[in-house]
Amino acid sequence: MNTKTLIVVFLVCLLVSEVVLARRCGGGRKIKIKKIVRKLRPIVRVMKVITRMRTRRPRPRPCNSS
């Protein structure tokens, strides 16, 4: 699997677990979800920077051993 997809899957799992915990504990569920989204924003920014770096620099062609 791609590293980017693994990160996304991991973040989704974290979100789901936090939402389940918020439901069990009751109370301000929306507030907890907002806090989770705030925590994830820097990670999303880092992923965007990585994708920009990859698209800007073309990958060198593999060397032919023939």
Curated annotation (Swiss-Prot):
Superkingdom of the organism of origin: Eukaryota
Post-translational modification: Contains 1 disulfide bond.
Main location as per UniProt: secreted
Signal peptide region: 1-22
GO cellular component: extracellular region
SS bond partners: none
Expression tissues: Expressed by the venom gland.
Localization of this protein: Secreted
Keywords for the protein's UniProt record, in alphabetical order: Disulfide bond, Secreted, Signal
Protein name per UniProt: Venom protein 27.1
